[in-house]
């Protein structure tokens, strides 16, 4: 069952001071300034003393065909000396004078009380006389340059355009919100991470990632002499981080010292090498004039260049004494800060939970 369109009541207050229309004559006979025309399910009119809130005040000089235009609302009125016709529906067989509205903030008496209210004022000129036939035939297309008649009527054409728009493929927009783990990434790491996302998953993508990682290690080895022993690295993995520190700090154990002399242990981890390599590739101007060097278990430095807030796992941790300008290895673990120090003309990157002795 077709649903009926909901109708909203419209109130028009006709102000005809010359009393040349039926509305003006009724208002004059009742000694009232306005004649109210109410349009809803029915049409009614009566003389009133003042307009109501949200009402239209139509000021006319005499008879005429008036069309009030208020956004999507259109009210058509025929005012003659002997009758009144009004509608909010389409009424295209007659010509009308278009009248625009002006909202105004006023105070009016409503239900016996003075209230602040908005009214919409509109003024007609009476240039279109009532019931002038509209000569334009809506079904007849005028002869317009560069325009041809379509094979569809207007409803079919609108439906056709709608169907084409709905059937057209739509571009899917993916979210580009950063992931939570990227919060602790350096600029170079975030860039590498973005490049990895762009690679299509598959065999070729994995090969590109492996090749990129291999190139990083080659560049690092060309700059820094790591002096790592593969056999020592295997022993370090088996013994664990705690035994490394114990081996480095236990100077009294002669058996261990003899073993260390033959195969020196290292506190440098694979993760440390990867992170340092990325820092070197940044080519920071503060470090351009310095050559890279590895930190010892303990040593001195000339000056502290900068500290950065980073978060990495399984790296050597140092304590710094800025007054004596020395650093000392504590253990291997997680860090949140890293110190960049210089010794002579060398750059030493000590990743640590930065603490001052």
From Swiss-Prot:
Biased composition (Acidic residues): 250-260
Keyword RNA-binding: yes
GO molecular function, one term: RNA binding
Region called Disordered, residue ranges: 169-191, 229-266
Pfam family for this entry, one: BTV_NS2
Keyword RNA-binding (UniProt): yes
Positions of transmembrane segments: none
Basic and acidic residues: compositionally biased ranges: 233-249
Keywords from the named record: RNA-binding
Function in brief: Single-stranded RNA-binding protein.
Homology family: Belongs to the orbivirus non-structural protein NS2 family.
Name of this protein: Non-structural protein NS2
Source organism of this protein record: Bluetongue virus 10 (isolate USA)
